[in-house]
UniProtKB/Swiss-Prot annotation:
Gene3D superfamilies in alphabetical order: GHMP Kinase, N-terminal domain (3.30.230.70), K Homology domain, type 1 (3.30.1370.10), Nucleic acid-binding proteins (2.40.50.140)
HAMAP family noted in UniProt: PNPase
Top-rank lineage group of the source organism: Bacteria
Native source organism of the sequence: Caulobacter sp. (strain K31)
Keyword terms: Cytoplasm, Magnesium, Metal-binding, Nucleotidyltransferase, RNA-binding, Transferase
Protein name per Swiss-Prot or TrEMBL: Polyribonucleotide nucleotidyltransferase
Location(s), subcellular: Cytoplasm
S1 motif domain location: 624-692
Length: 716
């Protein structure tokens, strides 16, 4: 019944098995990939003809994690998988980015790649397995795909690179680097880095590219036996048409790209496009003309040719800058004074308002992943409204691009966050892109760094980011610093680099051609370093160190540690005690299993009251210490004072004042706040307190004053 073909690849001490012919046989390509006990099914299907009027390449990649893969049932009312999680969206993009440039130019048939995680051993991350499986499925499908690609993850532990580290090894790694590429070149890089040098990161990319060759060769060997007949697709030759269009509007295009302002430049380009359409496009007046979609496609190619050639020949870019010049920068902080922290970061025509909000443990995001449930205390949300580019468009829930850009900025900033023990806040950053002309994700990194410092977050060091571009032709190449939107669109690379004065924290690279060499990557990283340092210097003009304290409108949090055997007493039966503490003091109390207690409130008095209460449960009152107390009952022989959480003690009438007190009720009233010193305990264990040895204004211990030696008295 089945014609099963299987390829086993020994890969870095692990075994990757690619199998086809048993499952999903009606798909154009289907591969079941297994590493360890992680299993992913990848399928590839493509339409056999393009839709009429199709003017772009409609590739869709869906990475889906089934909860049964980890032996779990989905939470929620419906008990089935719903909208994609953040990880599913990010991995879908991770697979899409290296395969998209490898389809034959001009191919506009719809392609859908679906990667389904069927089993997860909680050791081998399915994202790399899915990437390799998707590559294999496309290669054997017969689609005009110039692959295969390979992909792998690289860690860095004890100054050594680790291929495809396990989830446990990744926790100890200073680098989480994902690389995809062909046999000849790197296509995609995604990473989170703990302030490592450019040389170490570049070494990791080279290590990854060498390591993935085993997978690429294995896929080729599988395809030799399992691949379908190649789909007959011949890209249309448009060279003659391009020459005619260039003759008609080439000068107009060249003139348009000498205009520095984005809006004016786009208006001139639109006029040139209209002229080309009027001259060549098929219409009622010109029935023998060219199909408008085909004409627009040729027009875009001509645009790219003119811009790229100009940059390579002159070294001058669209807006008049040289290849390594960064646009003018202005950073401002505290622009929204009632928020916890805010910044406005403007670089040329790209601008972001970034707002930092500090919260408590209750504000952490609960994440239910295949690997288990956990809470995330650092959140970054990126919003890209259509008005930021002068357009109308869809508003609503974030798209894949917004989720991806937000995660890139999150990765760049996370290595510089303070330890949870030092700063026990939940941090939420929101980046509102208000203008965009290239590199809005890196503007988010810079603005977020400033906003957190404005909020009093003790960052280890500020972080800056820059987007690099590339123009690559047979006769040379140019690496561009701080690219514009047009340069991103017309260029060959989008290379985003973020880091501090000490090293890199994040790297993301997408190649639109068949890969780049190590030499180009090395130059891009070196040029990016200079750009990052310049941007960091401009940011430091706005703020170069975090504020010493959080703002007035932020919650205050203090942390104490209690013995784990006292946790039950603080919580109480059914949570009775902790609810009483919260209701009485007005503070929030959060206790974890290790005995760490976080107490938060809008003001310090509430926090102190809650902490004192908790200490009264978990600690014994200290003889000789002075406490704030409240009179709870006045009797003939003295007053009972609540002084240490729920603990009460007696201030005998003789200990109320240094002057004679006939009736305690003459000087004390119930509810009165007093300062008392714990004298000790009587034979029956009753607590003895004194007011008269404490200055009721300052809280000073008067008995210590009385005990001054004669020599000290003389000196005084």
């Amino acid at each position: 019944m089945f014609e099963i073909m299987r390829k086993t690849i020994e890969w870095g001490g692990k075994t990757l098995v690619l199998e086809t012919g048993r499952i999903a046989r009606q798909a154009d390509g289907a591969v079941l990939a297994t590493m360890g006990e992680t299993v992913v099914l990848a399928t590839a299907v493509f339409a056999k003809k393009a839709k009429p009027g199709q003017d772009f390449f409609p590739l869709t990649v869906n990475y889906i994690e089934k909860t049964y893969a980890a032996g779990k049932i989905p939470g929620g009312f419906f008990k089935r998988e719903g909208r994609p999680s953040e990880k599913e969206t990010l991995v879908s993009r991770l697979i899409d980015r290296p395969i998209r440039p490898l389809f034959v130019k001009g191919f506009k048939n719809e392609v859908q790649v679906v990667c389904t995680v069927l089993q997860h051993d909680l050791e081998n991350d399915p994202d790399i397995v899915a990437m390799c499986a998707a590559s294999a499925a496309l290669v054997i499908s017969g689609a005009p795909f110039m692959g295969p690609i390979g992909g792998c993850r690289v860690g860095y532990v004890n100054d050594e690179y680790i291929l495809n580290p396990t989830l446990d090894e990744l926790k100890e790694s200073k680098m989480d680097l994902v690389v995809a590429g062909t046999a000849d070149a790197v296509m995609m890089v995604e990473s989170e880095i703990q302030e490592l040098s450019e040389e170490i990161v570049l070494g990791g990319v080279s290590f990854a590219h060498k390591s993935m060759q085993a997978v690429i060769n294995g896929i080729i060997e599988l395809a030799e036996h399992a691949a379908k007949e190649p789909f007959d697709f011949q890209p249309e030759d448009t060279d003659a048409l391009k020459a005619e269009v260039k003759k008609a509007v080439g000068a107009d295009l060249a003139d348009a790209y000498t205009i520095r302002a984005k809006g004016d430049r786009h208006a001139a380009l639109s006029a040139a496009k209209s002229k080309a359409v009027d001259t060549f496009a098929k219409s009622d007046a010109n029935p023998a003309g060219i199909d408008p979609l085909k004409l627009i496609s040729v027009f875009k190619e001509l645009e790219a040719d003119i811009v790229r050639r100009s940059i390579l020949d002159t070294g001058i870019r669209i807006d008049g800058r040289t290849v390594d010049t960064v646009r003018p920068i202005l950073g401002e902080v505290g622009i929204l004074p009632r928020t916890h922290g805010s910044a406005l970061f403007t670089r040329g025509e790209t601008q972001a308002i970034v707002v930092a909000t500090l919260g408590t443990g209750d504000d952490e995001q609960f994440i239910d992943a295949l690997e288990g449930t956990y809470k995330e205390a650092f959140l970054l949300h990126y919003n890209f409204p259509p008005f930021s580019v002068g357009e109308t468009g869809r508003m609503g829930s974030p798209g894949r691009r917004e989720i991806g850009h937000g995660k890139l900025a999150w990765r760049a900033l996370r290595p510089m966050l303070p330890a949870k023990e030092d700063f026990p806040y939940t941090i939420r950053l929101v980046s509102e892109i208000t203008e965009s002309n290239g590199s809005s994700s890196m503007a988010t990194v810079c603005g977020a760094s400033l906003a957190m410092m404005d909020a009093g977050v003790p960052l280890i060091r500020p972080v800056s980011g820059i987007a690099m571009g590339l123009i690559l032709e047979k006769d040379g190449f140019a690496v561009l610093s701080d690219i514009l939107g047009d340069e991103d669109h017309l260029g060959d690379m989008d290379f985003k680099v973020a880091g501090t004065s000490q090293g890199l924290t994040s790297l993301q690279m997408d190649i639109k051609i068949a890969g780049i060499t190590e030499e180009i990557m090395k130059q891009a990283l070196a040029q990016a370093k200079g750009g990052r340092e310049h941007i960091l210097g401009e940011m430091n003009k706005a703020m170069d160190a975090p504020r010493e304290e959080v703002g007035d409108y932020a919650p205050k949090i203090e942390t104490i540690t209690i013995p784990t055997d006292k946790i039950r007493e603080v919580i109480g039966t059914g949570g009775k005690v902790i609810r009483e503490i919260v209701a009485t003091t007005g503070a929030k109390v959060d206790i974890n299993d290790e005995g760490t207690v976080k107490v938060s409130a809008s003001d310090g008095a509430k926090i102190k009251a809650a902490i004192d209460w908790i200490k009264s449960i978990t600690q014994e009152a200290e003889v000789g210490a002075i406490y704030d107390g409240k009179v709870v009952k006045v009797v003939d022989f003295g007053a009972f004072v609540n002084f240490f959480g729920a603990k009460d003690g007696l201030v005998h009438v003789s200990q109320i004042s240094n002057e004679r007190v006939a009736k305690p009720s003459d000087v004390l009233k119930e509810g009165q706040i007093v300062k008392v010193k714990l004298l000790g305990f009587d034979d029956r264990g009753k607590t003895k307190l004194s007011m008269k040895v404490v200055d009721q204004e300052t809280g000073e211990d008067l008995s210590k004053k009385e005990a001054v030696s004669p020599e000290e008295a003389v000196n005084t």
